[in-house]
Amino acid sequence: MTGRLWRGGMVFGGLMLLWGLASRSGIPHFLLPSPLAVAEALWVNRAYLGWHTLITLSEILGGLALGVTLGVTLALGMILSPRLQRWLMPLVLTSQAIPVFALAPLLVLWLGFGMSAKVAMAVLVIFFPVTSAFFDGLRRGNQEYLDLARSMNASFGAQLRHVRLMAALPALGSGLRMAAAVAPIGAIIGEWVGSAEGLGYVMLNANARLQTDICFAALFILVLLTLLLWLAVDTLLHRLIDWSPE
């Protein structure tokens, strides 16, 4: 953990150095504000940015909870019923073939400008990696353990609970890590399409007023939220699935 934090700090410091040098190379401030200008915008607008951060965070966490629940449920349903799999898999794939930006206006139209549309957008982005990873893990259970369970006359439910589920947990962990990384995308897209709250709204509003420092400040907060969410999920998975090399 310490080594990972050290490497992350080195990368962050390098990016800050490159950013600072680029901002002093003659690029206009309204195109690329300096790191100090962004830090000042973060401090001066801390109450304003803090409120909108809470809105976006609640949308992300709501979408993550519902998206993971939906993904796990779909994967279990498809592994339990091959017929259901034949019907659901094309629908799951179709949901990812449609661009997220194309669905955002429709969700805002159907669900309104409140939080529901943003959470629904986050669910659409999140559920697929969870479904795909968990279903693949369930399907690739250790054949030797499955044969041993069958030789002991274990029922399908017992095989699923004691063999397939345990073997699929690392794959589910990979899906959860991916979901944590992409969770903010759906919420931000929903805020861009139609919202008066959240970091996506802050970025659009600041961009329209050429307040690039505030736009960068909101983007910095969003990146920080994503990294912290991913680290929280990764740390939790390492504690819960400590027997897995992954």
State where each predicted segment sits.
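Transmembrane-helix boundary motif in ABC transporter permease subunits
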Residues: 62-92
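N-terminal signal-anchor transmembrane alpha helix
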Residues: 2-26
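Generic hydrophobic transmembrane alpha-helix motif, especially the helices
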Residues: 93-129, 136-137
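C-terminal transmembrane helix and the adjacent membrane-cytosol boundary/short C-terminal tail
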Residues: 82, 139, 170, 174, ...
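Short cytoplasmic-facing helical segments at TM-TM junctions of multi-pass membrane proteins
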Residues: 133-178, 199, 203
